[in-house]
Amino acid sequence: MKFFIALALLGAALASTHLDRYNSIERNIQESSFRAGREYRYLFNGQLSAGLPVPSTPQGISRLQSQVTLQWTDGNTVRMQLQKTRFATSQQESNSMKMLPFERFEEVERMNREHQELLSMPVEFDYEHGLVREIRFAENDQPWSENIKRAVINMLQVNILKKEKYEGAEKSDNQEPTFSFTNVERTLEGECEVLYTVEEIKKEDEQRWAKSINFDKCTRRPYIHHVQTPVCKDCQQTLEQDKMSSTVLNYNITGTSSSFLINSVELRSQHLFAPISEKHQLVSAFTLNTMELIYAGEKKTEIKQVRNEKTSELVYNQESEWAEQQWAQTGEEKYLRQLPQWTENKVEMIKKMFSLMAKQIEQGEAELEAAHTVARIVKVLRECNEEQLEQIYRHVAEHKDEKIAEQLRSIYFNTLALAGTRVTIQQFVDKVQSRKNIAPLKASVAIKTLVDMRYPSLAIAEDIARLCESDVSSSFPALRQSCWLTYGAIVNGVCGQTPRVFVQKNGVKMCPRDAKQRIVDKLVQQFESASTRYEKVLALKTLANAGLDLSVYPLEKIILNEQHETTIRTQAIESFRRLRTQMPTKIQRVLMPVYLNRQQPQHIRMSALHQIIYTQPEWSVLSQIGNQLRQERNQQVRAFTLSLLRSYANNESPCEQTFSSRVQSLLNNIPFSSQEIDRFESVYGKWSTYSRRHQSGFEANFASLFTTESVLPTEMMASIEGVLSGEWNQYFAQIGFTQKNMEKIIKKLLSNVQEKGLEQIVVRGKRASGSFQPTEFLSNLLEKLRITRRQSSEQDPHAFVYIRHRDMDYAFLPIDADSIPEVVRSMIQGGRLEIGDIERVLAQGIHFSASNAAFLYETVRRVPTPMGLPVQFTSKMPTISSIRGQVTFELEPKNGKSFDGLRLRVQAGPRVASTHVLSLRVICPIAEVGTKFLHQAVLNTPVDTEIRMNWEDKVVIRAIYNTPSEEKRIAMIQSRPVTFTRTVAPDARQYPEPIEMTYMLPAHKQLSQSLDREYPQIRVQGTLNRPTSVRIPQWIVDSNVEVYYKPNVEQYEAIFELNLYNNYKMEKNYEKVYKKHNGRRYLEAEPEYDEEEHREQITKKFEWLQNEKVYQHVAKFEIKPEVVKMEVEAVCNNDFHFCKTQIRGEELKATIQYVYPQTPRTVEELKEQKYRQLVVMGEMNYGENTIHININGQQSQEQKKFVKQIEQAPEHETLLEASRLDQYQTVVEYEFEPKPAQYFARYWNMVQAYLRTQYPWTSRIETREEPSRKNMIRATINVEPRQRLTVNMTIETPMETTVLERVELPFRLPTAQIHYQPRNSRYEQKPVMEKIAHHASKQANCVVKSTKINTFDQVAYRNQFTPCYSVLAKDCGSEKSEPRFVVLMKKINEKKEWKNVKVVYGENEIEMYKTEEGLICRVNGEEIEYQPESEIEKKQYNIIWLNKNTLKFDSDDVTVQFDGVNARIHLSALYRNQQCGLCGHYDNEKETEFYDAENQENTIPKFAKSYLYKDSKCNYEREMFEKEENFQRIEKNQEEEKDQEMNYEESRREQDDEPTEQVAIVERQHEICFTQKPVLRCQNGKSQESKKQKVTSVYCLPSSNSWARRQMREIRREPLAQWPEHKLRNLRDQPQMEERTVRVAVDQKCDKFDY
């Protein structure tokens, strides 16, 4: 036994001796300085780790050890050789901040002999005073080996003479002398500024030198950066800071500056990369190198002399990177041979990977490895030559199964484009041109991948141009468009300003100026020779994608050439977008004159401003924009400018913070209101959020540009951007729409529908079209007035829909007469849609099959490390997807005269596999190590759905989903951090799989949750892990979740049924519920009526409802089998003044009902009606939880006072405002189970906390002394009646009372109105979508009074009517010889303000006028007498009696409301820029309002006279039009004279409102005074006459007195008729109160409130 123990100890000792053979080397130092003819040996240890800079997190580590022999020859020449070099790797969880023993690593045992020989080759360098000058390597040495030797030499460089900039401080005798200085040196990592700090140790005769590299001050750095994000100046200061690099060397030196010896060196270096956010740590490459002197003495063995005249420098050699770049850009095989050949069997590797992919396709499942396989194929293809690609292509194209072969070919061509080398692109182009195995449409999609290629070049661009100009592109417009747009993007990658960093060598320019000029000339020539608008736009978008600085000059000519269409000029302005950071000043100089020129089209001006703001101009340009904004008359341009500036001022994007502050300063000096923006459609909006701490953010932009030429938006745009993979992706995605004159097509379609009806448009066979003949009066009117037709732009209707990605035009779709497919045109015959043609098209269905492989994005950074090996950080997202299926349509019933049903079936099998890879690896031909974080997702979601729709009697929609027949995995999500090592054998025939080790946190550092849950038809299983430490991010933790679908039924069916307007008989017991309604429980005082009166009014209301039409509306929703079932039933009368709605579900039952009081027709009826109560009652039961709610709506005293102020306004408008209910009292009784009660209490506490923080001065919460009845909430809401923008609210709960006073709302609050609303039967019978379009299109409003007209564009001017008809509004843009409508008005009595209004609409003539008997209406000569609730229904219009004094003509085009004196005209927005008459030009512009009958801008008198219809039946005073006071514009700030047009009857005249007595406030310097007795003051503050002074007694208090300031606010809100006793006592008790006599202004007469 002892023998075995002794043997074991001996073995351990021998092993220990073997393991530490380098660490136990004896040191023999015989020299004190470097001298010629001597030999020095150092032990070099290098350790390079890749992973997170957090202890005990995954690290992939490379370890290098070697003996370095240095021999000084003569002078300053040094020979160096590496001996006994060893290389090792490790995946262990180690702290890489210290040098680990070599024996803890796994050594590469059989290192390639070639590698050994390369590393042992000698090297010579000039070494003068510690600085390395010229280096000479062996001729056969390779770049990677040279760089390792440079790393060793780099550690010997120290500026021992201290020649350069010196900064030192003398120390005291007790301190060691130290000094520091800076110098610019060439180091392995670049030519940068370095800082030296020297500490001299006198006792030991040593010097400690510290050297650090300042990477912020480098003139040259050998790194590569391939990124797809645009340049962002501010982002470089925010997001780039976290990609830090630091290198520090510590030297131990003995001797003097002329004779020294380096005893030891330690280097620590770290390169940080932020894959997601700074908060969640960074990915780090940490280098630790040490060199320790172990021998200094006589030469043992002579190092061979290097016979190479070529010299190199110390900076990292990028020959390998240069060869890789040149191979990709040029395709010359000499560069391919210079690359490290890691395998000789590339073709066989790719064949096997495609075979594996074919099996996965055959199995019909998307696997996690599919995305990995795509990435590996791309990697190998990037190093394949033309011959190898042909072999691979033959293998892919010759698969036995044609369906699988089709998908493989599609993936292969995608990978060719993803590889992005010139050789792969040439094969792609050749195959597309030969039309072999790739359809042009698929080629047009695949070629888009080249937009973000890694190594673009002019040679590759010319290859793409060859495809663009080929016959196959000419035959397929989609391919031609994709080709040219991609060509521009590739040119931009080579010649434009991008964040890419390429390898530069020997001053070779990738894009010389003459090459750029040729490209610009080529594209400009293409633009000039284009015969169609589409071709011109394509050329401009290609120029935009190219982003060449030389394109500015031809683009400027196009923009300023007014002979070009507006669309072309706008596209030329958009073509500046890629130059906004490269040439901002030039863009501003070109576009600022365009924006400032008011003669330019509005669309061009707004587009120019948009691009100017994108350049983030300096203050000088912004001040010009602000000055233009102050005087801008074009309302659309002004609104767009304001909204654009406001959006940038409030922006949080890190790319625009500096600019945002400048814009905010500009807006602070420009007064504007949000209403100026909201009133107009042209608007620009931004919504952004950004967290600097988390380095995450998102921004959404939206813009709509409207002009006076069109009712449709001229341009609309929406875009998104944000942080992705640690970079702010500006202009990430954008979609837009631009159009010109498309309203022509829409208007024709709407006109056909209005004239013929939809049932005559969609027919089975052709029908004869009807005719239209104008009336004799209309013909005479047009002939005498000679009204010139308003013509829109002569350009034919056209539009473009475009998509942009990363600020590049990705695709655009032209829409015009030529682009409409022939199949659609054949369906339209004689202006009608033939159902038979529709059925034939739909019967064909849509069959689709597609497979795609793509990198959603790819970012690569390669940085050299001080160990001589580069590290590469890659962030990419390889994705593979496929889909096969079909869509079929059927109309029901088949072959019928019409159709009332539709059947749609969708069958598809989409499959997606995607992997987000964050990888940091050490690039070395011996062995690769690294760390990567994999986030993978797989989706397999088969779809088999059928939708059936029927609308014959009621709307029924059935959706049937057929489930899979067996259990299927539909989703899988996995997160996996791994460290890996890879050793490549050149003769390997399969892709070298790395040895991976998944990192798992220890149990005490993570919370694990196992998932094994089953839901109906769904099973979820997997493991979720969450770190316990905030330093460890979630995205590096291993997790896995799988979702399985388990069918237990064959299909699901969802049914939605809608049945409206069913006749219903009112039940008598409905009124019983309302009679129980008790007002005594409400919070406020008792109402003005008692309970008996309440019951009486309810009885009357329901008696009236018994004679009304009552309808039942039912909506049902159900999912079978028994998942959800819901039914909603509403019983309402025709005008919805009574409605009872019931909701029935499985556990939910709810009822809500309301009833309006009697609805008055006139103000007089409203005044006589005492009962004005709206009663709402509701009840809800859900399980054991119940809620009862009662709401009482009525009018407050403030509302009634407001009604008195507007009683002289036009009657119908008065009724609208007077009938509003502004006070709502609510009682809620509830019974909750414990858990819902807890939720309710929690949410109510959150609401109270919000009120305390948001409204601290206007809210208070009072605890009740005696808690009231439990489970009851009472509330009162009072809405301010004038603007309805503020509310007072009191909420009483059982324990407390919450009071809110004058809370401002962001919008005008709608309130209930109890006035009579006439029914429009013709309108009610329209389809829902037609109702919405009808309502939305009625935008313009013109008010015509006796002496004042407020036009459609809100321009007020004075006007005088005569006994002759004047044209108020007319369709002046109709393409037919006769207009669709004309509205005329004349004065019929000289002494009275009575008017006559005539409406000519089609073949009909409607005349309305005032007489002694009242309002008269004639339709085509037949008199219509007034009858309450009467309505004249015609096919195209209605005539409605609102009340005995007001009549309304209603049609789809125009609506006229007339009360005998005043008229209000509503006009459809489709007539914008096509209306003429006294109601103005109607183009949303106030400066172009007065266009006369000949379509010329004129003075107001001549404008009014041009629309006067003179005949033998009328005479007028010609002098009237010569008096300027009769026709003049009324400005907002101009005081208006008394208007006689507000009279309705002969005896009614404007009466001055008498001032009332109230307490007045006198503000004086440093004090506030209140009158002791009331004085006369106007209610609305508007005095009509000059005020008089009166001497009165006042109470005065200091202005600092809070009580006085509060009283002042209250009195101004609610005037006091006299002082209440309690307030008077408080006033007299105030400190420093004084009584004195002063003069106070007293009002004599007041202006009425002009509604």
Curated annotation (Swiss-Prot):
<dbReference type="GO" id="GO:1904109">
    <property type="term" value="P:positive regulation of cholesterol import"/>
</dbReference>
<keyword id="KW-0325">Glycoprotein</keyword>
<dbReference type="InterPro" id="IPR015255">
    <property type="entry name" value="Vitellinogen_open_b-sht"/>
</dbReference>
<dbReference type="GO" id="GO:0045735">
    <property type="term" value="F:nutrient reservoir activity"/>
</dbReference>
<keyword id="KW-0758">Storage protein</keyword>
<keyword id="KW-1015">Disulfide bond</keyword>
<comment type="function">
    <text>Precursor of the egg-yolk proteins that are sources of nutrients during embryonic development. May play a role in cholesterol uptake. May be involved in thermotolerance.</text>
</comment>
<dbReference type="InterPro" id="IPR001846">
    <property type="entry name" value="VWF_type-D"/>
</dbReference>
<feature type="region of interest" description="Disordered">
    <location>
        <begin position="1527"/>
        <end position="1556"/>
    </location>
</feature>
<feature type="domain" description="VWFD">
    <location>
        <begin position="1340"/>
        <end position="1515"/>
    </location>
</feature>
<dbReference type="GO" id="GO:1903427">
    <property type="term" value="P:negative regulation of reactive oxygen species biosynthetic process"/>
</dbReference>
<keyword id="KW-0732">Signal</keyword>
<feature type="disulfide bond">
    <location>
        <begin position="1342"/>
        <end position="1479"/>
    </location>
</feature>
<dbReference type="Pfam" id="PF09172">
    <property type="entry name" value="Vit_open_b-sht"/>
</dbReference>
<dbReference type="InterPro" id="IPR001747">
    <property type="entry name" value="Vitellogenin_N"/>
</dbReference>
<dbReference type="InterPro" id="IPR011030">
    <property type="entry name" value="Lipovitellin_superhlx_dom"/>
</dbReference>
<feature type="signal peptide">
    <location>
        <begin position="1"/>
        <end position="15"/>
    </location>
</feature>
<dbReference type="Pfam" id="PF01347">
    <property type="entry name" value="Vitellogenin_N"/>
</dbReference>
<dbReference type="Pfam" id="PF00094">
    <property type="entry name" value="VWD"/>
</dbReference>
<dbReference type="InterPro" id="IPR015819">
    <property type="entry name" value="Lipid_transp_b-sht_shell"/>
</dbReference>
<dbReference type="GO" id="GO:0005319">
    <property type="term" value="F:lipid transporter activity"/>
</dbReference>
<dbReference type="InterPro" id="IPR050733">
    <property type="entry name" value="Vitellogenin/Apolipophorin"/>
</dbReference>
<protein>
    <recommendedName>
        <fullName>Vitellogenin-6</fullName>
    </recommendedName>
</protein>
<dbReference type="GO" id="GO:0005576">
    <property type="term" value="C:extracellular region"/>
</dbReference>
<feature type="disulfide bond">
    <location>
        <begin position="1364"/>
        <end position="1514"/>
    </location>
</feature>
<dbReference type="GO" id="GO:1904807">
    <property type="term" value="P:negative regulation of protein oxidation"/>
</dbReference>
<keyword id="KW-0964">Secreted</keyword>
<feature type="glycosylation site" description="N-linked (GlcNAc...) asparagine">
    <location>
        <position position="1288"/>
    </location>
</feature>
<feature type="domain" description="Vitellogenin">
    <location>
        <begin position="34"/>
        <end position="716"/>
    </location>
</feature>
<dbReference type="InterPro" id="IPR015816">
    <property type="entry name" value="Vitellinogen_b-sht_N"/>
</dbReference>
<feature type="glycosylation site" description="N-linked (GlcNAc...) asparagine">
    <location>
        <position position="252"/>
    </location>
</feature>
